[in-house]
Amino acid sequence: MSVECWRDSITLRTYLQGPEDPHASLGRRHIYPYTMQDDLLHEAEDRDYLALHLENDLLHVIVLPELGGKVFSAYDKVAGREVFYRNSVVKPAMVALRGAWVSGGIEFNFFHRGHSHTTMAPVSAEMQEAGDEAGEGAAITVSNIDLTSRARWAITIGLEPGDPRLHQHVYLRNRMPWRQRYYFWANAALPALDDLQLVYPAHKARFSREGIVDYPMWKGRDLSLYRNHAVANDIFTLDVEEDFFGCYYPGEDAGLVHLADRAHSVGKKFFTWGTEDAGMIWVDLLTDEDGQYVELQAGRFVDQSIYEFMRPFQQMQWHEVWWPLHGIGGWVWASDEAALNFRLGEEGRAEVGAMTWRRHEGARIAVSAAESVLWSERADLAQNAPFTTTADLGEAATRAEELVVTIEAGGRELLRYVHPPEHTKHPSVLETGERDRPEPTPEEQCTAGELHLRALEAELWGRREEARRLWELALERDSALGRAHVGLGLLDYRQGRFEAARQHLQQAVDLDRHDYAAKY
């Protein structure tokens, strides 16, 4: 089956909102010139939404442009289940930057920390059919211009023939002639079932208000198990050296892998409202019949306290995939080609499971120790042909310092897994403790250079008046600090104070004729 794409409408029970605030929210700099969407009503009615569809023989995807361009549904036709948490109603609660927010599917958050300005607003959308720019596959691109920064974002959701993975291509562009901050996280909702297991290849994490903690075991508690999170919290992995993360549901024998080059998408987050009553109230606030959800998020940066600058007119893009798994009993490792489950038990017996997204006939799965093969078996692997077995590795497996599991096909190595994983063998450079950031130096003791760095951080966080104050203070302490003149010149330029901007930038050039930022 080729990839088909079409548009129609779907009807969803929708809890109504009153009119948006007619006035721009001047007191909320993080949303200006957007208005608030905070008049949430208790009445509901059936509403039709434009739905864009992609479908191949393995996956059926629905995107809703009128709800921020979110992926509303991704149905795994092989396993017969929704890949993500599908919320059958549109029931907003006060969560997003502008107020109203709905749960479910995959949402895309840009430029400012929090649920995006357009999460409950229509965005542009277009379809690329097979044979167009999408090649053999088909794709849906949703896009918008963020009014707070005038930067452009676009997400292309694509399917390929015979490929069970949902492809996500991210494009960001700074349309302005000055630097400005940016931020990106893809937020996938999944059902909050008691047996949910996280697969995050890390051994340190930033855990809510606890600072840096050991992961997954912390104070006798396995943080990789959803049921062990009684209260609402976030987990951000900190020392990830792999390109994957995801989850698995043993009861359903199904799960999910997210894959992306960590040079482009290093952030790996888990969020839950918690299992106690205080967290479960969000079930009634956000849905009618679909239960609780959790979030697996993939981000541009390590955690959501980080912004970076985009240069003037800079554009950037990268690729991510979401791959549904099933029938392999869990998973511990993944590559671009394969996913592996490996559980070593007593007396050298191991549970082994494997899956590949494309078909490989006669693939070889092998377990070795000290370059000696302890066990191997051949199998036909594919998305609709998961492989599982119990392998008898013998006593040598219990004595070996490490085991190497490989999946090979067609003369290529599709996956290599070292047990125990490399990231568990060496100490992290991060120290576990109640605080993961030192107390800042008092401002009156800061050097001009330190004040400049604080001003940059304030600019990154959108606190421009604070940045101005810090750069002016830096110049009081060192009048030859050209970087402070550049910072003030940029602030003045953005505010239309062109003569003041010219004076600051000229002073920076006079101090250093090689200051190309000031010359620009």
Task: State the predicted function of each range.
Residues 477, 510-512:
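Structural marker of alpha-solenoid helical repeat scaffolds
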Residues 484, 518-519:
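TPR alpha-solenoid repeat register
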Residues 16, 20-47, 51-55, 103-164, ...:
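Extended, loop-rich substrate-binding clefts of extracytoplasmic carbohydrate-active enzymes
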